[in-house]
A protein has these predicted regions:
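N-terminal positive-inside, membrane-proximal cytosolic segments immediately preceding the first
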Residues: 1-22
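Hydrophobic membrane-insertion alpha-helices, especially the h-region
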Residues: 21-35
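A cross-kingdom marker for long, charged
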Residues: 40-42, 47-56, 250, 256-339
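N-terminal Sec/ER secretory leader and immediately downstream segment
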Residues: 48-158
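A cross-kingdom feature marking solvent-exposed beta-strand/loop segments within repeated
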Residues: 91-101, 150, 236-246, 299-317
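Short, solvent-exposed secondary-structure capping/transition elements
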Residues: 119-133, 153, 175, 205, ...
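Long, amphipathic, charge-rich alpha-helical segments that form helical bundles/coiled-coils
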Residues: 136-173, 282-307
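Extended amphipathic alpha-helical interaction segments
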Residues: 159-287, 294
């Protein structure tokens, strides 16, 4: 009987050892996943136009009109794919599966990349409305519009395809016999900035709705003959759900990060146009407002205090910078429209 008791105690000790090892391993896994998630959630650093050209452009590419803009688009795409942790929006395993700040940041940057790719295909690479689309941009633009959350076939493979096509277009820009062009004209720039203006306006409204706003319906304002599909209410309260506040914040942060790089490149490519319209300072003001959105967030979480409350409201601060950039874009488009 004594031997049987010893045997049972030995078995229990063995089981306890295995349980302790399992619990310890799980705790170490969680700790490692948390630390890795924190590292992966750090936004990429800003880069200057010359640094981007040195990384992604051909030799002496800065001398060719269009290379700064195309190099920046390639840089944004490659950053999404090659930053620490890689592309996270379609991850199906921890720790990427548990993260949401960086995937929202990625989506904001991706939207700006898509808008620029569409502008390149639709306007910037074409001299007239009936001119032929560039073959490489025909591939790149839809490739960037592939579903960002798809795991199979992976979004990464489609975005790498877009990057390769953009690289081919960029090389051809410096080869006159290849027929690739980027036309730095005021009307082309105005068309692109119109898309930027609507994107920033939407982000500003979504950020401002973090505290809830009572808004009058101005959908048909200014046109007495205008109609819409369904009858809208005259006034409504718009408020971003509490669990989506940080999502909107980081989407705006990623969008602003990508856009400020694009506008720096546009300042280089469209320098003569901006000087002719006396609009360079206006563009610099937009860039400065966007740079302010990239300041370090010292709080461990995005706070949502009331407008004049005790606690900060990070969304309203971000909305302020985005709204000023939006207003400056509107002024810039007006300057470009002048003769």
């Amino acid at each position: 009987m004594l031997g049987s008791l010893k045997s049972r105690l030995t078995n229990l000790e063995g089981q306890s050892t295995w349980i302790a090892a399992g619990v310890g391993g799980f705790v170490l896994f969680l700790l490692g996943a948390v630390l890795l998630g924190i590292h992966w959630s750090q936004p990429p650093e800003q880069r200057g136009v010359d640094d981007i050209l040195a990384k992604t452009g051909p030799v002496d590419s800065g001398a060719t009109i269009g290379n700064p803009t195309v190099s920046t688009l390639i840089f944004i795409t490659q950053t999404l794919l090659e930053k620490p942790g890689g592309y996270l929006s379609n991850d199906v395993t921890p720790p990427g599966l548990w993260l949401d700040n960086m995937p929202n940041w990625e989506f904001g940057a991706l939207v700006q990349a898509r808008d620029l790719a569409r502008a390149l295909r639709k306007d910037l690479s074409r001299s007239q409305s009936q001119s032929t689309e560039d073959a490489d941009l025909v591939v790149a633009e839809p490739a960037l519009n592939y579903d960002s959350s798809k795991w199979f076939p992976s979004a990464e493979s489609s975005y790498y395809k877009a990057s390769n096509s953009l690289n081919s277009y960029q090389i051809r820009l410096a080869m006159p016999e290849e027929g690739a062009q980027l036309y730095a004209r005021a009307d082309n720039l105005r068309n692109y900035l119109a898309d930027v203006e609507t994107r920033l306006g939407s982000l500003s409204q979504r950020l401002s709705a973090s505290v809830g706003q009572a808004r009058f319906n101005t959908d048909l304002a200014g046109d007495p003959a205008a109609t819409q599909s369904t009858i809208g209410v005259s006034e409504r309260v718009i408020k971003t759900p509490w669990f989506e506040i940080d999502d909107v914040f980081y989407e705006a942060r990623g969008s602003a990060w990508a856009l400020l790089h694009i506008l720096r490149a546009i300042e280089r490519d469209f320098g003569s146009v901006l000087e002719n319209k006396n609009a360079r300072v206006s563009l610099k003001q937009v860039i400065r407002e966007l740079e302010a959105t990239q300041q370090t967030v010292w709080s461990p979480m995005i706070l949502n205090g009331s407008g004049f409350g005790v606690f900060a409201n990070h969304s309203l601060v971000m909305a302020s910078y985005i709204a000023r950039a939006h207003a400056a874009i509107s002024d810039l488009r007006a300057l470009l429209a002048q003769g």
